[in-house]
Amino acid sequence: MRKNGYFANEITNQISENQEVTENVSEYKINKPEKVKWIVDFNSNHVRYDSFPFATWSKIMRQKLLDEENSFLMTPSRNGIWELRSAIAKHLREFRGLTVLADQIIVGAGTEYLYGLIVQLLGRDSVIATENPGYRKISMVYESNGVRTIHLPMDNQGISIDELEKSDANIVHISPNHHFPTGKVMPAARRHQLLEWANMGERYIIEDDYDSEFRFSGKPIPTMASIDKNQKVIYMNTFSKTLAPSIRIAYMVLPFELMDKYTKKFRFLFEYGFKL
């Protein structure tokens, strides 16, 4: 009579305990960079440790763990935690005069990750214009994702519109509210020129609004996205400066048409989802 069910066989040890390893294993030594003590550190990505509210941060984390302990183990929302995206939308509306939906916001672990998503969304056949001088890491990340970048010169109003029009770029990445490294603020006239350029075909502006929270006096400069009537601006920002680089929270706001395209193309993705 044939028996049904599950049967377990004993697994014998395939390797003798006394067996010597005869294969030569190469030893790899990792050369760690030496720690240098600088006289003056001009690194622009540092925070003041004595200014960070560690006690408050720790108290909030403990309370959230107690209040929402089960939710920390659940599958996160697509495009980032919903509460975070809602808070970002509120912040943009109140602080930057930019009215967007939380559903337009994508949260990622750093701007580099979001740059890669933009490349996949707009295509590797895109040509991205960047500012010269500018933050060279931006073009390095784009190029590492297989996209050609061109570095366009600056004039007294920002990136040269004449050079942009002569180029074959279909995307321009700019920091109009606080250019790196000069600190220039792009005037309204140049912003409207760039928007007119973007309106001519399948072109987009990536507005990198880093450092927008910091100013000595007055109100913050309005974003280009807030005056964009044709959904041509992809707005980006990060909390690396306002909180800490280790937080690794960046976000971008996609125009509705691109958000629809993104949702269809990347429905399998779950971006930054750690609730803490």
Q: Which residues does each PLM region occupy?
A:
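Short beta-strand-to-turn element immediately C-terminal to the catalytic PLP-Schiff-base lysine
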Residues: 8-10, 226, 250-256
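Conserved beta-strand scaffold positions in the cores of enzyme catalytic domains, especially
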Residues: 39-41, 149-151, 233-235
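PLP-dependent aminotransferase class I/II
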Residues: 233-276
